[in-house]
Amino acid sequence: MVWISLGLRAIINVEALNMVESVGNVTRHRKAAIVYRTKSGYVIRWVPAISGETMAHAYQTWIAELAKKRKLPICSYCSINEFVKHSQPELFGTDPWEQKLNQIIKQRNYDPHIVEVEIIKNCVVEDIGGFLFPGPRPVKRTSRFSNGYLIPAIDAIEKVAIEPQFHVRHAPKAQQVIGQAQMIYYVEVGSAVYTWTFALDIDGIGRTSMIKVEDVISNDEKIRRIECAIDSLALMLDSKIFGAKLTRFNPLIDYESIVVTISHRYPFNVSPPSHSNYIKDTLHRSKKFSEFLGDEVKVLGYRVDIEEIEKYNTIMDLMAKVKDYVKEFLKT
């Protein structure tokens, strides 16, 4: 097994990356309840948050874009960033392999393994991001990547802001024609030191997992998909293009630190970046993990100041080295 884990902290100011509802003329930001400990006990607080689904959609969008440019297989809907993922027969696309698979599942006694094999072979987004077909014989592929919400750091929880911003659409000429063309509206925006975690099961790419475990693509194809998965993560983080309302509420994002680990035989995850000491804690745990299990864990970082961690000046340099280590581990 080769496993990648990533944790980061970022100062994000004036963002509207995940909105959940409109009440009258107010568009509300997503909020989540978090629990943390103080000197007097535990406290619950509602804070701005960006959902894991939001981040997963952005990541899979980058996978789809790279897949098209690199001539990797991708299904009809994923190619236009609609990740409905063969969830119903009506949503099977127009590609010949999809039409053929649609005929197979109409027989009702189909082999679920065959369905998983065909979708993995023909769509890199569903290979990496998983899918669920709830038919007479359900077929479920668990996503090869996992990620959480972007939530404020616990050690900066008192420095969180969420407020409605006042806006006016000023259209005096249009108002003469239709009336009430000039309108006021509010958009809630959040500012905080946000944290995020991500993990990627490298070995699971191009490999079935539901009925039986087997590789269904060539080794060369697997390497190309692994590179696509890592490059998509690098592009998303470096470009800072993820989330909603970027055209008018593109936030100021400043990464404080990013830590990536690559483990060889067992999954090792970066410590939660809820506190600034997560970098030291990750390094300490990686050493104990290696001693206990005899596994090798590489620890790399961007904007970190610990001597024993491999440091890189850009996100692209960091992720390029991650790819190198992954390929090295896959050979052993």
What are these regions (language model features)?
Residues M1-V47, A64, K68, I80-T332:
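Basic polyanion-binding and macromolecular-assembly surfaces
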